Structures are given as C-alpha cells and as structure tokens.
Amino acid sequence: MAASGEARRVLVYGGRGALGSRCVQAFRARNWWVASIDVVENEEASASVIVKMTDSFTEQADQVTAEVGKLLGDQKVDAILCVAGGWAGGNAKSKSLFKNCDLMWKQSIWTSTISSHLATKHLKEGGLLTLAGAKAALDGTPGMIGYGMAKGAVHQLCQSLAGKNSGMPSGAAAIAVLPVTLDTPMNRKSMPEADFSSWTPLEFLVETFHDWITGNKRPNSGSLIQVVTTDGKTELTPAYF
C-alpha cells in the first residue's frame, strides 16, 4: 500500500540497471511509491519483484505477472517504465550470433512484452508506458544483428499499442525512447576513449519520464522519440516513417 503523501505510483522494469536505479532513486526522493522489477532486489525501492531466470518466455511472463498482481492487488499505477535491456554485437556470420540474439530477445523483447501486458492490467486510464528502443534500429544494424532485431521489435510493439483495440487503458500512452548511447558507468568502462559529450545523461531521461508521467510535454501514444546528445546538449525528436 502507498503511504500517505506518496503522490504517484510507478513500476520500473529493469529497476536495478543503471537507468532503472536512477529512476527509482529520483521518484522515491519525490515520495512516490516505486516498485522495481529485476533479477535482483533494489533495496531503495518501495517494493521489489524478483524475476526468475528461465529459458521459457511463458514461465517468466506468468511468474512476473502473478507477482505484480499480488503486489498491487486492485491498485493502479501512474506509469510503467520499461528500461531493461542490454547490448551485444555480432554480424550474421558471428559464432556468437545465436547466443547474442537469444540474450537480446530476452533483455528487450521479453521485458517489453511483459510490461505491455502489465499495462493492460494495472496502468491507470491516462497513464504512461515507456519502452526502450534504439535510434540505431531505425536503420539496418549489420554489426549487431540481435540488438537491431530486438529493438526493431520494440518499436513495432510501441506503435501497435497505440492502435485501436490494443488492450491499453483509455487515454494511456505507449512511448518508446530511442537513445544513441547512455552515459552509464558500464559504457564508460567499456569505451573509455569515447566522446562523452555525445552520450545522454541518465538524469535527462529521468526528468523526461517525470514530465511525461505528470502530463508535461508528453508525446502522442505510439511515438518513437529519438534521444540525441551533441556537445552536452540533448534533444528529443520524433522518428517518422
């Protein structure tokens, strides 16, 4: 149950990742009720749902759906932020192709699909669902086949959720954010020579999510929002087809 004064309620799928942890911290600091969904607990969250690792999508989806249902009961949430994901490279000839594709599908497609179903059950009317896309996946990604496939599927899912009879609550919005590179400790460690001024600060996305949750400058449902940082300045631009 949300304590008195906790203005809003949010689920963060991937709540122990770099961006997810920042979301949990920022929204708890605003006295919101925030639940983390991840493979490990986030002790800073109001509650945590621990995802059991499995090679069966249906097993994992059923487990998470059941545990979120127990946690929330009849309570609705203002937002579900799916910020789970990861990166793996490799072209179609790579020995690691199958393994990396499997990983990318689990980290991006499974989490996004489960989040979407949770939205149909637990999101308020007029609420917000965000999904984690990628600007690179607007085009071909020959050097990272699995990643591009997974993110492309997330983009398609987002647009489907905005359509009539998608199952989403009335007035709710599904929006995908399409960054280039996020400024995370892991990315800095793996790419120490990179131009960090072209990386998007996590705080920018956290504040963007806050705006959209509170109805400020929220894009239309189905929008694929490119997140591009140049010389330390970040801009949001819709992708059009």
Curated annotation (Swiss-Prot):
<dbReference type="GO" id="GO:0001889">
    <property type="term" value="P:liver development"/>
</dbReference>
<protein>
    <recommendedName>
        <fullName>Dihydropteridine reductase</fullName>
        <ecNumber>1.5.1.34</ecNumber>
    </recommendedName>
</protein>
<feature type="modified residue" description="N6-succinyllysine">
    <location>
        <position position="76"/>
    </location>
</feature>
<feature type="modified residue" description="Phosphoserine">
    <location>
        <position position="170"/>
    </location>
</feature>
<feature type="binding site">
    <location>
        <begin position="11"/>
        <end position="35"/>
    </location>
    <ligand>
        <name>NADP(+)</name>
    </ligand>
</feature>
<dbReference type="GO" id="GO:0033762">
    <property type="term" value="P:response to glucagon"/>
</dbReference>
<feature type="modified residue" description="N6-succinyllysine">
    <location>
        <position position="70"/>
    </location>
</feature>
<dbReference type="GO" id="GO:0071466">
    <property type="term" value="P:cellular response to xenobiotic stimulus"/>
</dbReference>
<dbReference type="Pfam" id="PF00106">
    <property type="entry name" value="adh_short"/>
</dbReference>
<dbReference type="GO" id="GO:0070404">
    <property type="term" value="F:NADH binding"/>
</dbReference>
<keyword id="KW-0597">Phosphoprotein</keyword>
<dbReference type="GO" id="GO:0070402">
    <property type="term" value="F:NADPH binding"/>
</dbReference>
<comment type="similarity">
    <text>Belongs to the short-chain dehydrogenases/reductases (SDR) family.</text>
</comment>
<dbReference type="InterPro" id="IPR020904">
    <property type="entry name" value="Sc_DH/Rdtase_CS"/>
</dbReference>
<comment type="subunit">
    <text>Homodimer.</text>
</comment>
<dbReference type="InterPro" id="IPR036291">
    <property type="entry name" value="NAD(P)-bd_dom_sf"/>
</dbReference>
<comment type="function">
    <text>Catalyzes the conversion of quinonoid dihydrobiopterin into tetrahydrobiopterin.</text>
</comment>
<feature type="modified residue" description="N6-succinyllysine">
    <location>
        <position position="99"/>
    </location>
</feature>
<dbReference type="InterPro" id="IPR002347">
    <property type="entry name" value="SDR_fam"/>
</dbReference>
<keyword id="KW-0521">NADP</keyword>
<dbReference type="GO" id="GO:0010044">
    <property type="term" value="P:response to aluminum ion"/>
</dbReference>
<dbReference type="GO" id="GO:0006559">
    <property type="term" value="P:L-phenylalanine catabolic process"/>
</dbReference>
<dbReference type="GO" id="GO:0010288">
    <property type="term" value="P:response to lead ion"/>
</dbReference>
<feature type="active site" description="Proton acceptor">
    <location>
        <position position="147"/>
    </location>
</feature>
<keyword id="KW-0560">Oxidoreductase</keyword>
<dbReference type="GO" id="GO:0005737">
    <property type="term" value="C:cytoplasm"/>
</dbReference>
<feature type="modified residue" description="N6-succinyllysine">
    <location>
        <position position="93"/>
    </location>
</feature>
<keyword id="KW-0783">Tetrahydrobiopterin biosynthesis</keyword>
<dbReference type="GO" id="GO:0042802">
    <property type="term" value="F:identical protein binding"/>
</dbReference>
<dbReference type="GO" id="GO:0004155">
    <property type="term" value="F:6,7-dihydropteridine reductase activity"/>
</dbReference>
<dbReference type="GO" id="GO:0006729">
    <property type="term" value="P:tetrahydrobiopterin biosynthetic process"/>
</dbReference>
